[in-house]
Amino acid sequence: MVYATFNIDLSSKGSATGSAQLTGLPFASNGTTRGGGAVTYYHSTPALANCGGLLLLIEAADTNVTLRFYNSSTGLSADLTNSNFNNNTGYWGVLTYPI
């Protein structure tokens, strides 16, 4: 089992497209079980309507973490994208996954 904490503070968000991810974890997650975690603190983030929390998802057999937004109004979650960041956005969180 891997337990990790992280602290990411951007100085420039760039112009990436697609889902926001933390890539290159040192160990791949278990081939049959997902992992996850939570963003415990964030700052300088554009407003997220009905934000019920920011989640982390690691698919089975993966070394990438996808940052997700939970909408408390709809009960659905969606991946964060470039529009959910400013040049000085910061995220701190915790992550757990089986190997």
Stretches found by the model and what they are:
Residues 1-99:
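Surface-exposed molecular-recognition determinants
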